[in-house]
Amino acid sequence: MADLQKLVDDLSALTVLEAAELSKLLEEKWGVSAAAAVAVAAPAGGAGAGAPAAEVKDEFDVILTGDGGKKINVIKEVRAITGLGLTEAKTLVESAPKAVKEGVNKDEAEKLKKQLEEAGATVELK
């Protein structure tokens, strides 16, 4: 039981980017896709249940979709925004599309998008 508690503690200490990388590695190792499971489960939960047609979105994910040929500038900006080290920021930029920030409000998401685009990146908000 102590081993399970240690595992829970270790997983809880992961950053969002580390958790995403872990998820990707587990998907490859086990031959599954977390996105497919979510896509299948989502319609079953509320299909035809009278859900509101237009949901107001108050949290956004800032997704880096490319470096626009200005990789160094984009890496610098990603480091400034996320606080990541050089290697981690470089890995994030090179593995685009990737989330730079998740669950931010609209104003902050727009600000981050503008910063990244000024550095040469292509960005989308989800």
Curated annotation (Swiss-Prot):
Q: Species name for this entry?
A: Rhizorhabdus wittichii (strain DSM 6014 / CCUG 31198 / JCM 15750 / NBRC 105917 / EY 4224 / RW1) (Sphingomonas wittichii)
Q: Which family does it belong to?
A: Belongs to the bacterial ribosomal protein bL12 family.
Cellular-component GO terms for this entry: cytosolic large ribosomal subunit
Q: Which UniProt keywords apply?
A: Ribonucleoprotein, Ribosomal protein
Task of the protein? Forms part of the ribosomal stalk which helps the ribosome interact with GTP-bound translation factors. Is thus essential for accurate translation.
Query: What is the protein name stated in its UniProt record?
Result: Large ribosomal subunit protein bL12
Question: What are this entry's molecular-function GO terms?
Answer: mRNA binding; structural constituent of ribosome
Kindly give the HAMAP family that the UniProt entry links to this protein. Answer: Ribosomal_bL12 (MF_00368)
Q: Name one GO biological process term.
A: translation
Q: Which residues cross the membrane?
A: none
List, alphabetically, the InterPro entries matched.
Ribosomal_bL12, Ribosomal_bL12_C, Ribosomal_bL12_C/ClpS-like, Ribosomal_bL12_oligo, Ribosomal_bL12_oligo_N_sf
Carries keyword Transferase? no
The answer to whether UniProt assigns keyword Methyltransferase to this entry is no
**Subunit structure of this chain's protein:** Homodimer. Part of the ribosomal stalk of the 50S ribosomal subunit. Forms a multimeric L10(L12)X complex, where L10 forms an elongated spine to which 2 to 4 L12 dimers bind in a sequential fashion. Binds GTP-bound translation factors.
- Pfam families, per the entry: Ribosomal_L12, Ribosomal_L12_N
